[in-house]
């Protein structure tokens, strides 16, 4: 996968940097693995905005991804295609299992069409294979890591991300998260070996506001540009805030910790991401 730059023939093209999509081998998705996807516009079931700056964008269909893999333990799977997924930054790989079933997984870096992948405790340590953490050597880079055994991968699923197994002690493995946090995860949890593919995603530049709108993101309006009824920074003559910077709901911003204290999972965090 590479990046594509453009001649500045228009203002929107001048700084645009996008994927060249050379890693994509199949343009039409597998119909049996599609599901309808309704737009929410950032609203919850009460109709209230819970996530700002969402709405519009191109219509999408959801690709059903297998984040678990353990129920196919010991069954080899052949990579049929690498596909684009509009719902995530990573590419997805279409697998054909020896029992005839097709499934999508996150496409790890380095896999190609024709490769054979496996899952289960006896699988080889190579990119794309899924194993319990207890079977993966210390120092290995992994992605799609479970937090709870059997729940499916939740961590390190975005393009180019990974966790590193730092140590193992008793029933837990110590993992360095993509954020830098050191965290204990149960050794029965599954993880996929390797790094998530499409690692150049972070270097893409949209080039113009319209491309961001196609992705379903609306403008992010500054608080000082609003009226007093809309934001604590709003109103007044000129651009002054008048007080310490706050969120739209009045909480201090710029460094104020909002994480709820005394969470049950705190005992699994060995070092927070912002500690040196």
Swiss-Prot record:
Keywords recorded for this protein, A-Z: Ribonucleoprotein, Ribosomal protein, RNA-binding, rRNA-binding
Biological-process GO terms, alphabetical: cytoplasmic translation
Pfam families referenced in this protein's UniProt entry, alphabetically: Ribosomal_L2, Ribosomal_L2_C
GO CC list: large ribosomal subunit
MF terms (GO), sorted A to Z: rRNA binding; structural constituent of ribosome; transferase activity
Keyword RNA-binding set for record: yes
Ranges of compositional bias, category Basic and acidic residues: 230-240, 263-276
Superkingdom of this protein's organism: Bacteria
Keyword Transcription: no
Gene3D superfamilies: 2.30.30.30, Nucleic acid-binding proteins, Ribosomal protein L2, domain 3
Sequence segments annotated as region (Disordered): 223-276
SMART domains in the record: Ribosomal_L2, Ribosomal_L2_C
Cystine pairings recorded for this chain: none
Function in brief: One of the primary rRNA binding proteins. Required for association of the 30S and 50S subunits to form the 70S ribosome, for tRNA binding and peptide bond formation. It has been suggested to have peptidyltransferase activity; this is somewhat controversial. Makes several contacts with the 16S rRNA in the 70S ribosome.
Similarity comment text for this entry: Belongs to the universal ribosomal protein uL2 family.
Record text on subunit structure and interactions: Part of the 50S ribosomal subunit. Forms a bridge to the 30S subunit in the 70S ribosome.
Full protein name: Large ribosomal subunit protein uL2
Source organism of this protein record: Thermotoga neapolitana (strain ATCC 49049 / DSM 4359 / NBRC 107923 / NS-E)
